[in-house]
Amino acid sequence: MKILVCIKQVPGTSNVEVDPETGVLIRDGVESKLNPYDLFGLETAFRLKEQLGGTITTLSMGPMQSKEVLMESFYMGADEGCLLSDRKFGGADVVATSYTLAQGTKRLGDFDLIICGKQTTDGDTAQVGPEMAEFLGIPHVTNVIKILAADEKGLTLQMNMEESLEIQRVPYPCLITVDKDIYTPRLPSYKRKLDISKNPEIKILTLKDMYDTNEKKYGLSGSPTQVERIFPPESNVEKTSFEGDGKVLAKALLGILTEKKYLG
């Protein structure tokens, strides 16, 4: 069984600057980490490999520093890794990102199963996985919280649809996005880290390596949406001080709670 897991390096801090001209996050040199939801995707792949055998390839898109998350996936148990990195890919929205990942997947060959985390912590759109499946022309199932059955032909999955649980059977090849409730992710193996050579091979693909080399379909040029600005939510916190003895303070507090209708 050939499994592909899409992973992403996301900012590890909220102190991230934004390019004033493009509205894009400036990621170079920023403290980063593996997207938490992708840990659940990796663990799902490892469990399926243990059950059905096969190989696991991890795929990421970003600057060269994104090789760090691919290395982390090696230490956890991935067999191969590939990074899509080109300045022409920069500033991509969900559509351009999905298209780039789909093109990269085609260059890597055929996969039985593609796994994505439900969403990323820097975008929270939960759209890349489904859009990637559409570009590849394969069925997809989202919000997976449990694999009820897995065999050589397909998967039986339970999905969390917020107000209900849904069960579906999907044949290979397919793409699934997994939620945080599916498994507890394993930690990177120190022994495996020692066993892996200092410079394990990570395949690097650029725009010229894609089957479709039309740069207008990638990055900012291929993005139908663009971010105007990113800003923290406004906080309207009012502070009021009262002075007096216990009876005065109790009366003041009672008045506020009554006014705010906290007491019914």
Curated annotation (Swiss-Prot):
Protein EC: 1.1.1.436
CC cofactor: FAD; AMP
Q: Name one GO molecular function term.
A: electron transfer activity
Cofactor binding annotation: Binds 1 FAD per subunit.
- Superkingdom of this protein's organism: Bacteria
Describe how its activity is regulated.
Activity is stimulated by divalent cations. Highest stimulation is observed with Ca(2+).
Q: What is its main location?
A: cytoplasm
What the record says about temperature is: Optimum temperature is between 20 and 30 degrees Celsius.
Q: Where in the cell is it found?
A: Cytoplasm
Q: Which GO terms describe its cellular component?
A: cytoplasm
Signal sequence extent:
none
Q: Which UniProt keywords apply?
A: Cytoplasm, FAD, Flavoprotein, NAD, Oxidoreductase
pH profile of the protein: Optimum pH is 7.0.
Q: Which reaction does it catalyse?
A: lactate + 2 reduced [2Fe-2S]-[ferredoxin] + 2 NAD(+) = 2 oxidized [2Fe-2S]-[ferredoxin] + pyruvate + 2 NADH
- Which SUPFAM superfamilies does its entry note? Adenine nucleotide alpha hydrolases-like
Enzyme category, top tier:
oxidoreductase
InterPro entries cross-referenced by the UniProt entry: ETF_a/b_N, ETF_b, ETF_beta_N, Rossmann-like_a/b/a_fold
Q: Does the keyword Signal apply?
A: no
Q: Which family does it belong to?
A: Belongs to the ETF beta-subunit/FixA family.
- How the protein assembles, per its UniProt entry? Part of the stable heterotrimeric lactate dehydrogenase-Etf complex, which is formed by the lactate dehydrogenase LctD and the electron-transferring flavoprotein (Etf) alpha (LctC) and beta (LctB) subunits.
Q: What does this protein do?
A: The lactate dehydrogenase-Etf complex catalyzes the oxidation of lactate to pyruvate. It uses flavin-based electron confurcation to drive endergonic lactate oxidation with NAD(+) as oxidant at the expense of simultaneous exergonic electron flow from reduced ferredoxin to NAD(+). The electron transfer flavoprotein (Etf) mediates the electron transfer between the different donors and acceptors.
Name this polypeptide is given: Lactate dehydrogenase (NAD(+),ferredoxin) subunit LctB
> Could you tell me the gene encoding this protein?
lctB
